[in-house]
Amino acid sequence: MPVVYKRILLKLSGEALMGDGHYGIDRAVVEHIVVEVAGVLQLGVEVAIVVGGGNIFRGMKSAGDGMDRVTADYMGMLATTMNALALHDAMRRNGVVSRVQSALRIDQVVEPYVRGKALRYLDERKVVVFAAGTGNPFFTTDTAAALRGMEMNANIVLKATKVDGIYTSDPLKNKDAQRFQSLTFDEAISKNLQVMDATALTLCRDQKLPINVFSIFKTGALKRVIMGEDEGTSVFV
């Protein structure tokens, strides 16, 4: 059965990387994610990843606690770079070739973001991990995922979370919450379902770039989404 999506932008939240912990990186979770990514690479799918940093530092919370918002956001971008390096190292150990590109210049550690090079890496079947969000304060890593998805000519943005889709309310807090199989962008925005922030949703809607929200912890879920099976929640125009 052929894949439905040839090139994907995978958004990994920092919270997903810490697993059941409250801080930091769960190595077993990172290894699981790498195995899932390796599985779709074997199908010929090209993979770009945007990673968050909330497992290490939450800029908006720190700004709310009195820290300067711009400073807090830059610290959050550095946290995403740490996560990107952890993913890169896990991929190396599992035989997956990857490159890390950062929207902030840290040349001794990672490459700067250059769209042409990133596209070439994808053509060469290398995984590209994007760090530091958009490189600008006040923009979330969800918005970075939408932006990089468009720049990389991705067929879909896949948001990997701890739950298996979008629900009427938080299923971890409300056992009666119902999962949506699919939604339009306008429905997701009007219902304020917290799929992604409004900027990211609007960007994807305007560029007709679909989104799927799924659980990265379900073994094989990523592959099922790629194959077009009923997995997660699809958001489309």
Swiss-Prot record:
Organism: Nitrosomonas europaea (strain ATCC 19718 / CIP 103999 / KCTC 2705 / NBRC 14298)
The UniProt record lists the keyword Lyase: no
Assembly mode: Homohexamer.
Enzyme Commission code(s) on record: 2.7.4.22
Family, as annotated: Belongs to the UMP kinase family.
Residues involved in UMP binding: G53, D73, T134, G135, N136, P137, F138, F139, T140, T141
Protein's UniProt name: Uridylate kinase
UniProt lineage: Bacteria, Pseudomonadati, Pseudomonadota, Betaproteobacteria, Nitrosomonadales
Pathway(s): Pyrimidine metabolism; CTP biosynthesis via de novo pathway; UDP from UMP (UMPK route): step 1/1
Keyword terms of this UniProt record: ATP-binding, Cytoplasm, Kinase, Nucleotide-binding, Pyrimidine biosynthesis, Transferase
Primary role: Catalyzes the reversible phosphorylation of UMP to UDP.
Binding locations of ATP: K11, L12, S13, G14, G54, R58, T161, Y167, D170
InterPro entries: AceGlu_kinase-like_sf (IPR036393), Asp/Glu/Uridylate_kinase (IPR001048), Uridylate_kinase (IPR011817), Uridylate_kinase_bac (IPR015963)
Enzyme class at the top of the EC tree: transferase
